[in-house]
Structure formats: structure tokens, C-alpha cells
Amino acid sequence: MALDRLNNGSILCGDTGSGKSITALAYYFSKENGGSFEDEYIPMKDPPQDLYIITTARKRDTLEWEGELAPFLLSTNPKLSPYHHKVVIDSWNNIGKYTEVKDAFFIFDEQRVVGYGAWVKAFLKITKSNRWILLSATPGDTWMDYIPVFIANGFYKNKTEFVRRHVVFNRFTRYPKVDKYVDCGRLIKLRKMILVNMRFMKNTKRNDETVIVDYDKKLYSETTKT
């Protein structure tokens, strides 16, 4: 199970509808805070970690995550939860508001943390002082895309160290262009350490139906000749 393989700093990878959200909450509830729903209900430790979910503005506004919280008796309204702790759901546009949070648990949802902009800077600051996992359908297209997550996991101190160890730039272009990566065996090993794939079986079957209709045979014949 993906839940058994998750750890702090993991990337939970799966398509839409694969169950990433509920798996992430199950990890927070059980492995991070000692709760259980298996044989009998065991509540989380008292007090549990505050929970912050950074997601898309659409998911925040449609309360999609609120529905995922309910089975775990969690809510953004402390009065509706027996734990009375802080649960925050907000968008990536507001991630900078939470850089001073400490000793909480963060779920980063629906966004590849790539590049070197404000979101990545806030992400790296948050991960220094909190526990976290990241949910993504497409975690990275190139090794450069993994730099922020590798730094957050402590594999490299900064981008400069990563580039020095692994990146060869093309010398004949006016702008930085990666020519090749070196020591890819180490990169593959590091990615394997943090990437957890969801197993998702689509229970759909092909259904063919033949519909007999009238048509203009002459017109059809002329059309197919052109």
C-alpha cells in the first residue's frame, strides 16, 4: 500500500481520482499522529499537529478538501471536530502567509514545486520547520524540476550544489541550457527514496453498440472518393 511507504518528505504520485487526498490524510491521521480506524477507532494524540493543506484556489473554494476531512473527524471549524486544533485549507497564491508556522503538518497538493520563484522559496522555508508530503500527478519532467524537493529533503544544500554535481550546460548558447546530467544513478536513487506511486485500477469496460441508420448511398460514395 502507498500509505505504508509514505514518509516525511515523500511525493505521493497518482492520477486524478486515484485517492491521493484521502491517502495523505490517512498518513497524517495514523502515521504522524497515532490514530487508527482499522479494528477500532483510536483517536489521534492530544494535541495532534496542526494541519495545513496548500492546494488550488478551485479546490479551496469548492470545499473539495472539506469532504475528504470528514471521515477523519477533521474540520476547518474547530467546533465541528473533537480535536479542536487548527486545520487550514488555502491556495498556493497564499503560501507565503505560512512561512512562520512551526511544528505542523503540511500537505502540498496539485502543484509541482519547480523553478525558483516565491512559491518555491516559501515551500523551502516551510519544510525546514514542519513535517510534510507533496501530492502530484506529474512530479517532474527533468532532473532540474526535482531540485526544490531534493533540497527540502536535505539531499543538497542549495541549487548551486546540485548544479555543480549533476549539470553540464551547453557552452555554445547565449542562455543556460542543460546539455546533459551526470551521476544520474544517484539521482534515480534519491527519486526512488521519495516517490510513492499510487496503484489505481480503472474498472471500466468497453461497450460497443451498432446503430443502423438510413443514408444517401450515392452521396456517401461520392464523398469517400474525394
Q: How would you describe each model-predicted region?
A:
Residues 17:
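Walker A (P-loop) phosphate-binding loop of P-loop NTPases
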Residues 56, 70-100:
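Inter-Walker segment of RecA-like/P-loop motor cores
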Residues 21-28, 40-71, 140-145:
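Conserved Walker A/P-loop ATP-binding site and its immediately adjacent core
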Residues 49-50, 105, 122-203:
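Conserved P-loop NTPase motor "coupling/switch" region that bridges the ATPase
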Residues 1-13:
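Conserved pre-motif I regulatory segment
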Residues 109-111:
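Walker B catalytic acidic pair
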Residues 6-8, 83-84, 96-104, 127:
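Short basic/glycine-enriched coil/helix segment immediately N-terminal to the Walker B
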Residues 133, 198-226:
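Inter-lobe connector of SF1/SF2 helicase motors
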